[in-house]
Amino acid sequence: MDINSNYSEEDNPLALKADFILSLCELVVGGKEGLQPVEKTVIDRCVHVVYRKYFENPTPENMPLLEDLYNALLTQDEPEARHVAAALEIYVKGSLNIFNHHSNVDIHNRIVCFDIKQLGKQLKKLGMLIVQDAVWGRVTANRSAGKSTRYYADEFHQIGRAHV
């Protein structure tokens, strides 16, 4: 759930991060229809709540975790919020909680390698979405700094297969 001030080319990086988190929740909640409008609303509301502390003091330890979103959803009155929180629970407290930690990837290195080969079937799509988000954050930060970015994807066909 990492974000930086250059995350978006627009004035509001939080709007783009909220869109990413909606996509993440769409994968987690699943279903043919995707997220319902009320679910999207409570997720968006909670995203703004959990990032408030970080934007007041943008230090790595204040970066929100998936668990912060989960806890914020549990405080909402709408039953849809509890439905989304229940779907997130396995990714927060359960056996698929691999992404509920601060990142150990130093995105500021000249070369960054993301290896998601060992992710199981349940985490593969989520892992690819998170990698794409991290790459986007790096590309926008580099663009703001006037740097070019090269992006190499091995096994690129896996990205297309995940969306089928």
What are these regions (language model features)?
Residues 2-163:
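P-loop NTPase motor domains
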